[in-house]
Amino acid sequence: GRWNKESDYLAACIMPDRRTFIQQSAAVLGGLALHQSVGAAFPGIPKPSATIHDAGDDADLWRHIRSAYACSPTLINLNNGGVSPSPRAAMDALDHYNRMCNEAPSYYMWRILDQDREPLRMNLAALAGVPPEEVAICRNATEALNTIIFGLPLQPSDEVVVSTYDYPNMANAWKQRALRDGVKLVHADPPLPSEDEEAIVEAYTRKFTANTKLVHLTHIVNWNGQIMPVRKIADAAHARGIEVLVDAAHTFALLDYRIPDLGCDYWGTSLHKFLCAPFGNGLMWIKKEKIHKVW
């Protein structure tokens, strides 16, 4: 008899201090606001006075961002490539919803959490600069890219250009397709690290043949930090009718770009890296006219 109607009950179950959550998140998003697409996804976040080029010297900005995190008193976290820490606001929200869902799982998950799924997808799409119907939330870059790799209708005579620098999970997925379906893998071996973009592009394009159907590109190579000239390779590939898949695990929310800037057809990333989302979150993007091909 405490609740007059179901809507009152549902409202009480939502994290009670959303305003505090947003205010705390502003410290983290303040750093992200240096990127061009944050304004579209989070219009309430003010633009910082610093530019993306001089923010490294803005002690006040980084002190503000640091205060949003629960840092270890004994360890210095230097590895943000594999997984980044989530800010306190995200951890508190995750703990709240986890406890709430375990009180009555089917009720809370479907009546409450599901209501936020589409707004979240729309915000992520805005951050990535693409229509929401082209993105899907998943668990990480590996799941996103594997969904595409194993879903593409490739035939035994088809060739896929990969690199010796691709992430092991992706390399193994392509090896699986080669063993199961007879897809031919052609390895590019660009001279890395290198500042010669044309040499990197040429290392890929010289592997293109009439049978090449797709080129797999790693946006940032985790071994050495090389930023690959994805757009140049993609343009060269499309000129030959070749599709482009981009592993953006290490670039989303780190480099200042939107997905269309890359000129690719398929793309996947992890959100628990530089976006600092809770562990086990990723994003998959497929160009609208290509979605039907992945099954």
Language model regions located:
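N-terminal secretory signal peptides
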Residues: G1-P16
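Pyridoxal 5′-phosphate
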Residues: P16, I22-W295
